């Protein structure tokens, strides 16, 4: 009897674990700035961290696409700057080199495909460029 109960409990735990993974979605991920305030200028490196919210752990090896940085927080969405991906850094961090030509608020928008996740993860992160 005890053996059947133990087996049933093990199966139940495995099913619950699988169902939680199956219920994971794009909303379970969060892009956050590594440093929210940056010095304005050319060749500034902007770094974000992709986090799996249920565990708080960084997500490595995501495929990042459609990055864009502009001054929409300042009402100047057409004031965009080029972004160049930068390799290296801590696991779960994604960096871009850009030119923050003006002080003020900048918005980084980007999307990611996470391995095993059907939905696309999107993020909008605000940075402040200072003099």
Task: Please identify what each model-predicted range represents.
Residues 19-21:
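N-terminal signal peptide c-region/cleavage motif recognized by signal peptidases
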Residues 24-131:
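Contiguous segments within soluble domain cores/interaction surfaces
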């Amino acid at each position: 009897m005890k053996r059947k109960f133990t087996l049933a409990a093990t199966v139940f735990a495995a099913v619950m674990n699988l169902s939680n993974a199956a219920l994971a979605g794009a909303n379970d991920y969060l892009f956050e700035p590594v440093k929210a305030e940056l010095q304005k200028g050319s060749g500034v490196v902007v770094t974000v961290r992709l986090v799996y919210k249920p565990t708080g752990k960084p997500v490595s090896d995501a495929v990042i696409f459609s990055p864009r940085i502009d001054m929409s927080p300042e009402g100047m969405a057409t004031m965009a700057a080029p972004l160049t991906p930068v390799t290296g850094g801590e696991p779960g961090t994604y960096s871009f080199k850009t030119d923050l030509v003006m002080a003020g608020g900048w918005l980084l928008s980007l999307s990611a495909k996470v391995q095993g996740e059907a939905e696309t993860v999107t993020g909008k992160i605000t940075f402040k460029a200072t003099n």
